[in-house]
Amino acid sequence: MHKHHNGLKTAALFGVLWAVLLALGALIGAGTRSSAPIWIMALVGVGTTFYGYWNSDKIAIRSMQAFEVSEAQAPQLYQIVRELSARANQPMPRIYVSPTMNPNAFATGRNPQNAAVCCTEGILQLLDARELRGVLGHELMHVYNRDILTSSVAAAVAGVITSVGQMLLFFGGGDRRNANPLAMIAMALLAPFAASLIQMAISRTREYDADEDGSQLTGDPLALASALAKIERGVTMVPLPPDQRLVNASHLMIANPFRGGAMNKLFATHPPMRDRIARLERMAGRPLQ
């Protein structure tokens, strides 16, 4: 039920995102003689996003300074990932470890054949084997559900809207006989803001799905709930610096790796941790002890 609802919500959010783009395009068509520079920038935005999608594993791993580990170096990680991959009838991903003490994990790659799973030193020290299994189930489901593609398409559309909005502010001075200048300025400013909010909402919806699907894969929702509770406390103690490379990769992680704040919550790529834990408790039919 939750998964069906989240799928409809994701589709609806994509619909709103495209509606914002079409409204912006219609306004440009009514108010400018030529929109060529705008659409050139839009294509650049799409191309950049496609590059990011195709190389998502390399970009995220590089941003976290992660290194690939062998089974001899990380036997527990290999054992858990091999078991869950076999259970899902999917190929074994590459396994990486990041030296940061921020307790986090992520999976990336454009498909299961090109997937990579990364755990930080912080999360490996913080969680027990059962909790780590819950986290890895969540991360693997992001790959199996093609969430990298979903987030890339959302980023592409949001990027187009932002590029068009910026170009409209600078180059929107053509023939305005059929346009309302105030409406054009308002749309140029508000459309990127709205697109970012929608993009973040899509990301939060996919997190809920990965929680649910990952718990079904492991058969242990409370293991993930316990892990999330520990991770929330650990991230507060050891937040990552808001470096732009880390910000760009943060939507892949199981928890927001930065220190919280009012604006961070508004643009959060992850749902509130208490809501995620409550959903997992309902799946298990009992509260987390």
From Swiss-Prot:
The keyword Cell membrane applies. Keywords: Cell membrane, Hydrolase, Membrane, Metal-binding, Metalloprotease, Protease, Transmembrane, Transmembrane helix, Zinc. The active site is at E139. Its EC number is 3.4.24.-. The chain crosses the membrane at residues 11-31, 36-54, 153-173, 182-202. GO terms for cellular component: plasma membrane. Its cofactor is Zn(2+). The keyword Protease applies. Zn(2+) binds at H138, H142, E207. PROSITE patterns: ZINC_PROTEASE. Binds 1 zinc ion per subunit. Gene3D superfamilies: Metalloproteases ('zincins'), catalytic domain. Its main location: membrane. InterPro entries: HtpX_protease, Pept_M48_protease_HtpX, Peptidase_M48. Belongs to the peptidase M48B family. This is Protease HtpX homolog. It comes from Pseudarthrobacter chlorophenolicus (strain ATCC 700700 / DSM 12829 / CIP 107037 / JCM 12360 / KCTC 9906 / NCIMB 13794 / A6). The lineage of its organism: Bacteria, Bacillati, Actinomycetota, Actinomycetes, Micrococcales. The gene is htpX.
